[in-house]
Amino acid sequence: MFRNNNNDNNNNDNGFDDENKGIFLDSKIEISDETSLIHKPYHDDYDENGLINNNNNSHNNNNGGNNNNHGPSKVTHRRGKHTFTEADKLKMTKFESLDFPIIDNQIYREYIRRTSKLNHMLKTFGKWIICFMIGVLVGITAYLVKQSVEFVNEFKFDQSGKYLEDERKFIAFLVYYSINILFGVSASLVIIPVGQIASGSGIPEVKGYLNGIRIPQSMNVKTLVGKLVSLILAYSSGLILGPEGPMIHIGSMLGGAIGQVKSKTLKWYPKVLWKYHNDRDRRDFISTGAAAGVAAAFGAPIGGVLFGFEEASSFWSRQLTWRTFFACLIATFTTNIILQGFDMQLHDYGVLKFGLSNKYLYKYSELIPFALIGVAGGLFGALFVNLNAHLSQWRSKFFANKKIYLRVLEVFILITITSTILYCCAAFTPCRSKTQANGSQTNSLDTSSSSILSSSGDNSKNSTKLFKLLNNASGEDKQEDKFIAFFCEQGEYNQMAGLSFNSLDAALRLLFSTSTDIFTIPTLAVFSLISFILTTITSGLMLASGLFIPMMLVGATFGRLVGQVIALFVSVDPCIYALVGASAMMAGFSRMTISLAIIMVELTEGTQYMLPVILSVMIAKWVGDFFNESIYEHLIEQKCYPFLQSQPPKSMIKLGVVDIMKTEVVTLHEVERVSKVIEVLKSEQHFHNGFPVIERPRPLDPNRKDAYGNLEYYEDETTYSGLILRNQLICLLYYRIFCHEQPLPQNPRLLGGNSNRRYNQRRFGRPTEYGYAPADPRMTYELMTQSLARHFPPIDKMNLKKEEIETMYIDLRPYMNLSTIVANETYSYSETYSIFRTIGLRHLPVVNKKNEVVGIVTRKDLL
C-alpha cells in the first residue's frame, strides 16, 4: 500500500540548502547523548557543493545508492551498461534531489482553508502572466543573439573580403584566422569565472534539473550571463557549432528566474510572487523556458512544446501544455516582430528559418532512398555519439587536476585546425561558372528569412563585399542565393566557399536550394566528411555550443549528395534529400522523433514533406537505438547526474525494495528535544535532508479509555507519522518555535482540576487517548515558504541559549508532511522505482505491516 496526494498546490522550496553548508560544521554546542537509530548513511545526504563529504570519507560507501545487498554500483539503461568509478561516485554525492511533491502539513491545510476562490484564480492568472514574460524575454534574447552574431560576422567577412578582392590569399587568411581566434578564445575565457557549467549546450543540465536533480549553479544569474556572452562570441569564431542548445538552457534559466523573482547569487529575496517559490512551480517555469528557447531559435512554436514534452521534461500536465504553448507563441512572435522592425505586416520569419519550394513534390518510389538515408542517419548518429562519448571521457581524464587554461589552449588549437581546413578547402577548389548553376535552377529557398548567422543587410552594396549574389531565375519570387566569389573571376563562384567560408545557416540555405547544379558530387562528399569530423572534435570544448545546426549541416550535405547521385539517373529534387538527410542525422544523434519532425517542417515550411521526414526520423532512431543511446543520455552518465529514466534498469528488476533500501534510519519523534534536533542537524557522519517522524510514546494498557490516559507507563514505538525536511527544522530553530515542556502532560485533574485542564487544552490542544493533539501552529505557511527561500546563518550564530537547547522541545506535528508516499517492505524494485520516478519523490520511507519504519529509499539507491 502507498498513500498518495493528488493536491496540485505548492510545496516548500529547498533552494537554500546549498547556501547553508556552513550551518552544521561550525557549531560547538554541547548536546545530549540521546540519539535515534543511527545507521549507515542514506541520501539525499550532501549539500550541492559536497563540503560535508570533504571532511568525512566514510560516507562514500553508498554514494551510488547501492548497498551491499546487490553488488557494485552501476547504472544500466535500455542498452549497454555504464559502471561508475569511485571518482564518479564521489561526484554523484554533490547532487541533491528537488522536492516536487507538496508538503501537505497542517499549516498548509490551514492556508488552503482560508484562501478564497479569488486568490486561487489570481495565482493561476499569475502563472499565465509569468509565461507571457518568459516568452517575451526569450524572444528578445534570441534577437540580441542574432543581431550580435550578425554584426560580428559581417565585420569578419568584410575585413577578409577586402583582401580577397585584391587576391591576397595569405593576408585574407590571417585576418580571418585572427578574428576567429579573438572571439573563440574570448568565448572560452568567459567560462573560467562563471564555471564550466556554462559551457556546452546545457541540455543535460536542463534534463537533469527537470528530472529532479539540483545541479549546482545550473540555473543562476551568473551562469545565464556567462552562457549568453560565450554563445555570441563562440558563433563568431568560425567553429562548427550551433545556437539551439544554449538557447534552450538560456530559456530555462530565464524561466526559472522570472518565476521565482529571487536570486541566491545576488542574495535578493523579495516577497513578490512568494506563492511560486517552490520546486514544483519552478520546474514548470523552467520547462516553459526550455520550450520557448526552441521556439525562438527555430521559429517553431509547436515544435518547442513537443520538445519540452518529449525530450526535456520528465513531468508534464495538460495545464503545462497550454501555458507552454502560449509562451512559445509569444517567444516566436516577439522575435519575428523585432526582426521586422515592428512592421504591421507580419511574415513567417524566425531567428533560424529556411523556406522550401511548394511546387516540387516527391514520388512514392523515392520513399525507398528516403528510408536508406534514415538508415545512414542512424548509423552516422550512433557513430557520432560513440566518438563523442570516448572523446569526452578522454578530455575528463586528460584535463583532470590540470590548469584550466589548458582548456583554453584546446580551443585555440581547434580554431586553428578548423580555420585552416575550411579556408584551404575553399582555396583549392576550382571556380565554376554561374551559368552552370543557373541552367537548372528552378527555385531557391527563402533567404528573406533572418538567421542567427546571416547578414540582413544589402550584401551587394559595394564591390568589396565578400558575398556575390546570384539572381534567382524564377520570376515569381524575387529571391537571391548567396554565392562567394573567393578569387574567382566575374561570373564565377567558388562552390566549396559557399559551404566552408560561410555562416552555417547560409550554407544550409544553399543546400536546401532546388538548383541541382550548385554543388558537384565530389564537393559534397568532401565537405560532408570534413564537417562530420570537425563537429565531432568541436563538441565538448569549453565554450557555449550546440549540435543541432552542425548535425543538420552534415545530414543535409550527405542527403543532397545522395539526391544528386540519384539525379544522374532519374529526375529528382536534391533539396528534398537534403531535408530528409538533415532530419535523419538529427534523429540519429538526439533520438528525437515527434518534436524533431514538427521542428523540421516548421523550420522549412515544407508540410508536403512530412511523410519523408517522419519516415527518415523513425528509421534513424531505430537504427541508432540498436547501438547506443542519445548523446544527451551519455553526457548525463559521464557527468554522473543521478538521472532516473522512465523505465527501471533491466538488470535490477528481480530485486525487491528490501534489497536497495537503507535499513537503519535517523528518525525524530513528533515532539522532540531541541538538543536532539541540533545533534541530528550537526552530525557530519549522517548528513541527511529528510527525517521520518514517528509517533509519540503510547500507554502500555490498551484498554484504558480515559481521555487523558496514564502516561507514567509507556512503550516506545516507531510507527510512522510523517516526514520533516532539514530546511524546515532549520527554519523552526531560527524562529525559535519551541515548547517550554514536552506537550504530554499528566492528567489535568491530578494537576489542579478544571483550571489546569483549560490551560493545558489552550497550551497543547484537545485531549486524545494518548495525550494532547498539536497546539495551534505558531508559524504560518506564508512565513515558512518565504523563509525557506533565504539563507539562514549557522546554528552557532542563531544565539540559541543553553537553557533553550537543554529544556525546550519542538512540536513537529504542525509542520511535518502528513501525506507522504510510503512503500511496503514487500514491494518489488520495479514498483518502487515507478512510484519514485512517477511522482518525483525525494525520500520514500519503507514500512512494515504495522506501519513501522524499517527503511528509506532515495534517488541514488535506485541507480
Swiss-Prot record:
The GO cellular component terms are:
chloride channel complex; intracellular membrane-bounded organelle
InterPro entries linked: CBS_dom, CBS_dom_sf, Cl-channel/antiporter, Cl-channel_core, ClC
Q: Which domain of life is it from?
A: Eukaryota
- Name the principal localization, coarsely classed: membrane
**Topological domain, Cytoplasmic: which ranges?**
1-124
Give the matching Gene3D superfamilies.
CBS-domain, Clc chloride channel
Q: Where are the transmembrane segments?
A: 125-145, 171-191, 228-248, 289-309, 324-344, 367-387, 408-428, 518-538, 539-559, 561-581
Q: Which ranges carry the CBS domain? A: 661-742, 816-863
A GO molecular function held by the record: chloride transmembrane transporter activity
Subcellular location per UniProt equals:
Membrane
What are the alphabetically sorted keywords of the record? CBS domain, Chloride, Chloride channel, Ion channel, Ion transport, Membrane, Repeat, Transmembrane, Transmembrane helix, Transport, Voltage-gated channel
Note the topology in the membrane.
Multi-pass membrane protein
Concerning its family, UniProt says: Belongs to the chloride channel (TC 2.A.49) family.
| Known role | Voltage-gated chloride channel. Chloride channels may have several functions including the regulation of cell volume, membrane potential stabilization and signal transduction.
Q: What is this protein called?
A: Chloride channel protein A
Species annotation: Dictyostelium discoideum (Social amoeba)
Name of encoding gene: clcA
